[in-house]
Amino acid sequence: MAKITKEAALLYHSQGKPGKIEVVPTKPYSTQTDLSLAYSPGVAEPCLEIEKNPQDAYKYTAKGNLVAVISNGTAVLGLGDIGALSGKPVMEGKGLLFKIYAGIDVFDIEVNEKDPDKFIEAVKAIAPTFGGINLEDIKACLLYTSDAADE
């Protein structure tokens, strides 16, 4: 394996568009009709279908191919408890791996919360958005001590 220098690592993460992941459209967007279908008023129809049958979220949204990579940065490999924001490059890196090796889209989510119950409540509150949740670099005792983890 090649030796990675501090300078090379910082340049890799900052060159061009900063970060390692982005969101790109999957539907046409070049005409007014496209935009009206993507947003208002056309977006109402899939919303109403999902309201009737929540499983339709997998048919009409990105949910089925979308994973949340969530961390509070309390146990980042080799770095320890560096905090939620400082762990963001790691979560973006995990997102890159999901995308290139499995074709799965990822949102990295850094939760600035060390209280186990509050952290788990935050994750549960956003869970409907995602087809999967990947908890990453979280001190194990934070999850095992929570009563909410049993739910």
Question: Positions of the model-derived regions?
Answer:
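Metallocofactor- and cofactor-centric catalytic cores in central/energy metabolism, strongly enriched
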Residues: 2-143
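Conserved small/polar residues in nucleotide/adenosyl-binding loops
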Residues: 144-150
